[in-house]
């Protein structure tokens, strides 16, 4: 009697999900026990989120940062299924896709990613723009082109949240809009980039000042209208005209994850063990934005792309170990520093004893992210384009 091939189902094709699938495909399963690996995502493309900002300034093209899953998974043995998850039966580990097939699996990986909460103030759902997905970038690009084509005197942009995303967006948009832009950064606390190294925070402050970005600290958003934003500063309400409001504050877990009968924290994140297994469910793994994860030392980890990237290696190994009778490894996070883009051809980085800003940091950031691209083939294509594009531009001119 032949033994049925085990199946691993990975829900979500972001850093956590895709990189787990790719790593699993490389691990040495015994031939008779080699599992079927299924990756499910509602989109047809992976998105290298840290480089999404470069689309706004035409520094990068869509294919470079958002290659199709089918291209990335070619010859890996991983099966890609595009669809929206509409139901997960935890007890039987069965996954139902909207207008799609149903999967039963032996190991389930939850890596569905987070969402931007737009329901925190009145009017945000209707009028604010989020910036997390390729669709978000296209929607913002369409609005920018419309405003640029109108030849208005000024294009007024308010960005809510002076964390990493808010600061990076402010610098890119200020560079794109130039003299026409009036970019405002709104932050509830008394400091921008609170968790950032001091070197990066200083570099960001200088970049924002150079680009004449207004920074409103200790300021709350009261409401957002079709062409206004209402700000509260020390009890005084100001209503300002605005053309675009970008909302970068917060990450929330989708309702599909919140509804699962699994242990969760107050934010709805799934609570995992140091081996990235769901508490009381060793056959289900979770990583990325939807998981509350503590490493081997008990330290609670941030929900960043860098953490998800490293979690993927451990998740893949621990799934392999659980299927082949090997010991599982507790996750050990290695902080590799922090990088931010601060406008066109400008960045800052701090970590591993290195501190850089300006164009040199921009080049180092690009090379670091090129190395992190999902597959060697894609690294080669993108790397060659980065080398050849300046030469092509020079020849055109």
Regions found by a protein language model. Name each.
Residues 126-153, 239-310, 317:
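FAD-site-proximal beta/loop scaffold in flavoenzymes
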Residues 2-79, 158, 167-196:
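Beta1-alpha1 glycine-rich phosphate/pyrophosphate-binding loop at the start
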Residues 16, 113-116, 251-253:
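Short glycine-rich anion-binding loops that position phosphate/pyrophosphate groups of nucleotides
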Residues 1-7, 75-158, 232-235, 246:
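FAD-binding core/adjacent interface of flavoenzyme oxidoreductases
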Residues 76, 80-87, 175-274, 278-280, ...:
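A Rossmann-like FAD-binding core segment of flavoenzymes
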Residues 311, 316-397:
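C-terminal, flexible cofactor-proximal segment of oxidoreductases
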Residues 148-153, 182, 325-333:
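A short alpha-helix-loop-beta-strand transition element characteristic
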